[in-house]
């Protein structure tokens, strides 16, 4: 972990400071070193280190996984932060998701194929919960019958 952080994340962190991400109207582009760092991280298996072998993990104690991942956060939180969010998302599914959700989503998050995210944006609301404008409404008459869980449409700031 320390070697990957030093050799891949540190240079990518600096490159990201110098060469900012940019949007071409369809996709966001990052420096090539960001992709190389993320790929090295995913290949290391540390994203799933505390998971069972059946989920692609190493069955390490959670505290060992957290300590190892601290190298990545220290070397470049902009790149390492994505792993933390993805791991948190996948762990939530492991604790509360159905078997189908775990297979469809968590497995791919732990491998690095999918990424989890945290979307928090209610700029007008601040800490006033009554000012939150985002709404979730059922998506179709059979929204609860989807094997991956109920579907909702979100409107407002996301």
Model-assigned labels for residue ranges:
Residues 1-81, 100, 104:
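Amphipathic, small/basic residue-rich leader segments at the start of a protein or domain
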Residues 25-33, 95, 111-117:
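Short, mixed-charge aromatic SLiMs
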Residues 41-42, 88-89, 146-147:
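Short hydrophobic "helix-edge" motifs at membrane interfaces and signal-peptide entry regions
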Residues 50-53, 81-84, 119-122, 158:
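Glycine-rich, histidine-containing beta strand-loop boundary motifs that form or position
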Residues 58, 100-158:
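Glycine-rich, Trp-frequent "lid" loop and neighboring beta-strands that shape
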Residues 81-99:
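N-terminal glycine-rich flavin-associated loop
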């Amino acid at each position: 972990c320390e070697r990957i952080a030093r050799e891949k994340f540190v240079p990518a962190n600096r490159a990201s400071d110098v060469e900012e991400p940019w949007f071409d109207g369809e996709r966001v582009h990052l420096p090539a070193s960001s992709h190389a760092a993320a790929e090295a991280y995913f290949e290391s298996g540390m994203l799933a280190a505390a998971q069972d072998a059946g989920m692609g993990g190493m069955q390490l104690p959670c505290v060992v996984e957290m300590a190892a991942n601290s190298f990545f956060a220290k070397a470049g939180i902009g790149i390492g932060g994505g792993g933390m969010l993805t791991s948190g998302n996948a762990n939530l599914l492991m604790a509360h998701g159905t078997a189908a959700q775990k297979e469809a989503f968590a497995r791919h998050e732990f491998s690095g194929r999918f990424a989890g995210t945290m979307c928090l944006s209610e700029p007008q609301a601040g800490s006033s919960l009554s000012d939150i404008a985002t709404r979730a409404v059922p998506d179709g008459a059979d929204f609860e019958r989807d094997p991956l869980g109920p579907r909702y449409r979100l409107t407002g700031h996301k």
